[in-house]
Regions:
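Rhodanese-like catalytic fold shared by cysteine-dependent sulfurtransferases
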Residues: 1-32, 39-74, 83-126
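Short, surface-exposed ligand- or partner-binding patches at beta-edge/loop junctions that are enriched
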Residues: 78
């Protein structure tokens, strides 16, 4: 019986993962940068320019948003460590999207490398 890790490994074998050192160029070339983490994760910090569409609703949102339904869009996806993004990339390819990439290592790798991010906007009570 397969587990989640097995499914992620299978997905990664079918998609293109962009290496961290190539990520900024891939993001600049992309039409859309999608963060597929949950909303609370996104609000805690994310890559500049990303829009948040959680993995659980991704296919529905893309199908119903005229700006996102064009199959020729160049899309870069990321999540926390790259598992959800790999599964999402596999789904988008199955939907007919032809230019889909997943960020290897996800937001954790991006953050650990000291790359630019939008930090949480927490209230200051002082």
């Amino acid at each position: 019986m397969k587990n989640a890790h097995d499914l992620v490994l299978e997905a990664k074998a079918q998609i293109h993962e962009v290496a961290l050192e190539d990520a900024e160029a891939a993001i600049r070339a992309a039409d859309q940068l999608l963060d597929v983490r949950e909303a609370d994760e996104f609000h805690a910090g994310h890559i500049p320019g990303a829009i948040n569409i959680p993995r659980g609703v991704l296919e529905f949102k893309l199908s119903n948003d005229p700006a996102l339904c064009a199959r020729e869009l160049n899309i870069v996806l990321y999540c926390k460590t790259s598992g959800r993004a790999a599964l999402a990339a596999c789904s988008l390819q199955a939907m007919g999207y032809r230019q889909v990439q997943s960020l290897a290592g996800g937001f954790d790798a991006w953050s650990a490398a000291g790359k630019a991010q939008v930090a949480a906007n927490l209230p200051n009570f002082e």
